[in-house]
């Protein structure tokens, strides 16, 4: 069976189920949206989450797709960047647990990216996403070795803004014999 490698934002999902949507209003997060947040907003959310029951999961669009494929028995790998912290360790251990080949890079300067996920009573999800180390993945981080042995490269649509990295990844994948695939994550990527 052909193997597939994903390239994307290595994020940890911190999930919390809400009793009502008051907290979303308080944090100025529109229900059902995905908002990029800064460190100050992340700290504000973490303060709220410290008083709630939360659950951790690995995330990011490409990470989720690769995990799903691994669970179906496909040979998979993942390229992303995490911080040198407990979230980065969690992400790496989850890849290993699910037999996903680990091509994670580690930032010593930035913490791991976190998608604070608020689940409303009606099941709607709202994300406050701090990219952290995930956003520091650059073209020069990628090596030919990362792409060898894979038939397909799955590129997360949220990365299309970094044209240099995407083009370099495609060049390396092509040199390694991979085919490519891109997932456009939101209508914003289609119309911009």
Regions found by a protein language model. Give the residues of each.
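Short, structured coil/loop segments at alpha-helix boundaries
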Residues: 76, 85, 162-163
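Ribokinase/PfkB-type carbohydrate-kinase core domain
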Residues: 1-31, 54, 89-110, 114, ...
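Glycine-rich anion/phosphate-binding loops
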Residues: 56-60, 85-90
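Acidic, Ala/Val/Gly-enriched low-complexity intrinsically disordered segments
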Residues: 190-191
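Residue-level signal for short, function-critical loop segments
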Residues: 82-84, 158
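Glycine-rich phosphate/adenosyl-contacting loop at the front of the ribokinase-like
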Residues: 1-77
């Amino acid at each position: 069976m052909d193997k597939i490698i994903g390239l994307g934002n290595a994020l940890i999902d911190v999930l919390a189920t809400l009793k009502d949507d008051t907290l979303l209003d308080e944090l100025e997060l529109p229900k059902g949206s995905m908002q990029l947040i800064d460190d100050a907003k992340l700290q504000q959310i973490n303060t709220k989450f410290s008083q709630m029951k939360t659950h951790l999961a690995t995330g990011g669009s490409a990470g989720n797709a690769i995990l799903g494929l691994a669970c179906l028995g496909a040979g998979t790998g993942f390229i992303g960047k995490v911080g040198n912290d407990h979230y980065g360790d969690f992400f790496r251990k989850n890849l290993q647990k699910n037999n996903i080949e680990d091509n994670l890079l580690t930032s010593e300067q930035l913490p791991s990216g976190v998608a604070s996920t608020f689940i409303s009573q009606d099941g709607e999800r709202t994300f406050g996403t701090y990219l952290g180390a995930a956003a520091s993945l650059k073209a020069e981080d990628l090596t030919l070795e990362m792409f060898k042995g894979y038939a397909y490269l799955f590129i997360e649509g949220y990365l299309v803004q970094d044209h240099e990295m995407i083009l370099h990844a495609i060049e390396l994948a092509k040199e390694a014999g991979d085919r490519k695939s891109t997932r456009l994550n939101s209508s914003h990527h289609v119309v911009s």
